[in-house]
Amino acid sequence: MMKQYMETKFQYQDCILFYRLGDFYEMFFDDALTASRELEITLTGKNCGQEERAPMCGVPYHAVESYLNKLVSKGYKVAICEQVEDPKTAKGIVKREVVRIVTPGTNLDTQALDESKNNYIMCIVYIADRYGVSVADITTGDYFVTEIENSAKLMDEIYRFSPSEIICNEAFYMSGMDLDGMKDRLGITIYSLDAWYFDDAVCRQKLLDHFKVSSFAGLGLADYDCGVISAGALLQYLLETQKNDLSNLTHITPYASGKYMMLDSSTRRNLELCETLREKQKRGSLLWVLDKTKTAMGARTLRKYVEQPLIDKKEIEKRLDAVQELKDQAISREELREYLSPVYDLERLIMKITYGSANPRDLTAFRTSLEMLPPIRYILQDMQSELLKSITEDLDPLEDLCSLIASAIHEEPPIAMKEGNIIRDGYNEEVDKLRRAKSDGKDWLAKLENDEREKTGIKNLRIKYNKVFGYYLEVTNSYKDLVPEYYTRKQTLANAERYITPELKELEDMILGAEDKLYALEYELYTEVRETVAAEVERIQQTAKAVAALDVFASLALVAERNNYVRPKINEKGVIDIKDGRHPVVERMIPNDMFIANDTYLDDKKHRISIITGPNMAGKSTYMRQTALIALMAQVGSFVPAKSANIGISDRIFTRVGASDDLASGQSTFMVEMTEVANILRNATSKSLLILDEIGRGTSTFDGLSIAWAVVEYISDSRLLGAKTLFATHYHELTELEGKIENVNNYCIAVKEKGDDIVFLRKIVKGGADKSYGIQVAKLAGVPDLVINRAKEIVEELSEEDITTRVSEIATKDKVSKKKPKVKKYDEVDIAQMSLFDTVKDDDVLEELKNLDVGNMTPIDALNTIYRLQNKLKNRW
């Protein structure tokens, strides 16, 4: 047995081998050490002919999935080695084979997977400075392929699909991409595969064979090179791990990565699209607000929509038309939602059916779902919007399959497939006969006994049974002259003879073998039904996608109606004009409609950048996020929380909101912030929407102000970037840029002062804030009065008047200089800001500054010295 184990393990060295022994899956050697540690199970030992006992541990077969999922969730590959012959009939060692390999991206356990999101596996091939990318979810049949020209866009695709597993060629693995960051921050397991997986000819042939086509033109892949290699390598990997023909992968969809709005991981987190930033929960996210879907398929599709907003105006309008019609047709919509409610996850059910793992209850769940389709289609037939008409056409009621399952499968079958009671009475004559034999055998024997007495005239004829002869007819010697010729003698006794007849033999076979035959026949018929359903996988998948899309549009329509959303107008002119916009999540979290609505106006001309000032806690971040979310919702195809909204299409949304130290990579808060800013400035376009909060706060005031100022100038210049931007800052000096840079406008959060206290009005108004109210916010936060009072004294001594004046002077100077035809390079813009902090040529002040013993000064001594030197300079200037 151990020899067999070692031979199997040699073939799957990168896997933990679950080796079936009776009622347990056993692990040995290093696998046992790893499994016992990760699963927290007892480690024992086994004699295997070596000097030391082999480490061993095991898990019961009936609970294997929970242990399996725990290992897979930690990034391990697990090979399942099953007994493939009956131990009772085996000669020698029972034959065993690996029947599947489970990895994070190939887990088929629907109980362990989140039904509201896809479980993607991605294959990346790096060849000649291009990336071939393919993505599949084998639980739903999704299969996509594209080609990408640079690493930034590749990261966008990784963020968009959020795969649980990436397989790649060695060139990508060694390309310098931050693979550790993907593993740690995104939770992705990454494997580099052997070179033969990526052989061009092998990959191409795999795809042609699987999809049964003769050329790639029929697949839409004629112009794809490294994309085809990626898709072929992924298919080969899936075939090897699943050990089946992957018949639910019926289509491969090529796509252009530029079809959707790009959202990097920072933006997805900061906008809390699908989960909250802190708790990592759905409640409190945008998806939580929008998701009123009734089916798992609909929930997954809505999540895709939220994570992949459209950038094509026609496609957006089609979605909005569908939502509009279902919003207007409220009665029909609620009827549809009522019929959608009992529909199970058709995509993952058909996966189980095609892979042969569906149990009888899965088929009854499938039938229950199909029974809902005719009334859904009936209601849809009067809809007029293009997408709803398309859904109606694609929604095949599958009445033939529904009828087959209803007639063949018991109403309430067991989960087990080989314990009978699966096939419905009346479906198969042989099943009915065996079932009667199992339950009515004694009655049949009594009837046969009575019939034989009447036919032969043998009054004392008896049917008896023993283990040697089975059932037999016993006739006493006094009546043996009446025994007919078709009786066959089996045994002679002193006073009687024992006989069998063909009919009795048939009854015996039926009675004694009825249960075994019944269970075997029921299983055979069940698999026939299952295979008949599996053969229609393409019809079922098409219907599943239609049902999912309908569920999404009905959900968005319901949310729009309940939450008083409006249909956004979509424009391609770069204008974002929102009246009385509201944050979709925050307004649902606070009571009694207390949310304060605000307007937003941005365009590509004179309103490109809004500089927003105001105290902490006043609502700046909420306002900026709300604008981004409204723009995103519109491009998803959803109605939006506003009185009116005219949304210009954005190709990307970037957010730079908050930061913390990245201890794992040794980066400070400021370094994290600057890295994010650099990413935005490199990858944003003039069609992007930027949400920037407190740029430059992680360093000294002067450095921070310089950087923030330079960033505003860079973004505002259409020759450099020219993106629409909401820019929140505590550097009130930046408000001087309004009027100096023609497309910069000031806004602030209105505040009402009551003595030393303040009230946040949450209203965005024109103009800049004259102070930050930091001391008042500190008071609201509960800072001790002693500290508050001292802070008031210090703030009166510190004046920023000179800084503000110098900002105005430099901005004016820059405005004049920019009239020259030469375009400044970005590093020149940086250098220009340094004039704000030019050294004052007062030798005595410089000398005193040089001689200060900074290391031994208290904070208050430092402040007093700064104040004294500042006054000295004021008097001279």
Whereabouts are the PLM-identified features?
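Amphipathic alpha-helical coiled-coil segments
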Residues: 316, 323, 333-339, 366, ...
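Active-site phosphate-binding and catalytic loops of NTP-dependent enzymes
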Residues: 81, 104-113, 245, 381-387, ...
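Charged catalytic and DNA/RNA-contacting regions of genome-maintenance
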Residues: 1-325, 341-354, 358-450, 796, ...
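Charged, surface-exposed helical/loop "interaction arms" that form contiguous linear patches used
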Residues: 355, 359, 369-372, 425-426, ...
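ATPase nucleotide-binding head domains, primarily ABC-like/P-loop NTPase cores
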Residues: 29-32, 224, 294-295, 302-305, ...
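Conserved catalytic alpha/beta cores of large enzymes that bind or transform nucleotide phosphates
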Residues: 158, 163-171, 177-180, 192, ...
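Amphipathic heptad-repeat alpha-helical coiled-coil/stalk segments that mediate oligomerization
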Residues: 198-206, 213, 261-265, 273, ...
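C-terminal tails and terminal domains of large nucleic-acid-associated
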Residues: 835-877
